[in-house]
């Protein structure tokens, strides 16, 4: 086949295929989905296409589950729309993996079904003694609308540190294709071996 105008030699990766291809928390795979998952796990690049309602989201979530379970680092999941990313986030989360949904700062005010998995909501929900300063500053910022310069700098530093912790602990990070360029991903020592 050809990729970007160049002839590409077919490659088969040597991987330990799972004994069972369906993922926990997701529907059993049909024959086409099973074939797709098995093929994708053995190739460096794959394309899955099909009409709406044919199980591409379940197939993708199953693939992500198996890629994450191989222990080769975090998996970055991208889709072109926020709705697609939210659907994938929900399905992947159902498998029991630690999933974080990264959305643009401009979308943080938009409520979704996966808010509890969104980075900004996870940061707000932190309630450990070490995070009390961040929580107090967040409440103050919510109440006043803005912080004085010194408090704003401290707030940003603490929030950035909390975001880094959450992102580094995730098995899977889901975002839009544009969101994959978010500075919060580049400022963190992430271990993406698969996207």
What are these regions (language model features)?
Residues 50:
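The Walker A (P-loop) glycine that initiates the GxxxxGKT/S ATP-binding motif of P-loop NTPases
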Residues 25-44, 59, 175:
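N-terminal pre-P-loop "Q-motif" helix
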Residues 46-47, 76:
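Short hydrophobic/aromatic beta-strand immediately N-terminal to the Walker A/P-loop
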Residues 41, 68-69:
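Residue-level signal for alpha-helix termini/capping positions
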Residues 57-65:
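Motif I (Walker A/P-loop) of helicase-class P-loop NTPases
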Residues 1-22, 65, 71-78, 83-192:
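Conserved P-loop NTPase motor core of helicases/translocases
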Residues 53:
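Walker A (P-loop) phosphate-binding loop of P-loop NTPases
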